[in-house]
Amino acid sequence: MTRRYWNINLEEMMEAGVHFGHGTRKWDPRMAPYISAKRKGIHITNLTRTARFLSEACDLVFDAASRGKHFLIVGTKDKAADSVASAAIRARCHYVNKKWLGGMSTNWSTTETRLQKFRDLRVRAEMGQFSRLPKRDAAILKRQLSHFQTYLGGIKYMTGLPDIVIIIDQQEEYTALRECVTLGIPTICLIDTNCDPDLADIPIPANDDAIASIRLILNKLVSAICQGRSSYIRSR
């Protein structure tokens, strides 16, 4: 894998609060190699290591995107949801930003069935078919459509399992991570000082609670994906 320059700036990361971890009582000892100090009861992440792993992750997604691979971004907590959606849309990635439904990837046949029903309901709504139904029936279908849009809206164009999954907050998205591990899908995880770095293929030690930190990491990754996609389009 060719290493590239991704303009990862330590000062920029400090301004975004990427280096702030959790309280020293809430930590995973396996994160010790990624922690540089303690300050006022808080662990401080070693940003040099963060930059190294973020650069490695950018190289990986660039190479994958340049070969036409597909990505899924997962981040369902309130602080991450909007950033996940906007980053994914910008890079034409699939995303889950409300709730990971158990078995979404390991029970892919069920997910496919749900997606097909979601597509059918969208078509019926666009054709105005709901207005021709009894009010009660139309209301039921509208509720189903709204439910699907909330939980499956970010993956409505998925036709198969993703090639790489980017996860924001390992602990919050533990079910999604375990499903990826089970299926052998490579993962890039934003991990705070209370996480297990060994669970991800590429862990990126960073503050997973600050919106600015989440947005900065995502912006670097999707920028690399967009560049990779451009390379893929030019080579076709």
UniProtKB/Swiss-Prot annotation:
Which Pfam family would be a valid example here? Ribosomal_S2
In Swiss-Prot or TrEMBL terms, this protein is called Small ribosomal subunit protein uS2c
One GO CC annotation: chloroplast
Ranked from the top, the taxonomy reads: Eukaryota, Viridiplantae, Streptophyta, Embryophyta, Tracheophyta
Q: Which compartment or compartments is the protein found in?
A: Plastid, Chloroplast
Family classification: Belongs to the universal ribosomal protein uS2 family.
Q: Which organism is it from?
A: Nymphaea alba (White water-lily)
> InterPro entries, from UniProt?
Ribosomal_uS2 (IPR001865), Ribosomal_uS2_bac/mit/plastid (IPR005706), Ribosomal_uS2_CS (IPR018130), Ribosomal_uS2_flav_dom_sf (IPR023591)
Residue ranges crossing the lipid bilayer per the database entry: none
Q: Which UniProt keywords apply?
A: Chloroplast, Plastid, Ribonucleoprotein, Ribosomal protein
Gene Ontology biological process terms, A to Z: translation
Question: GO molecular function, one example?
Answer: structural constituent of ribosome
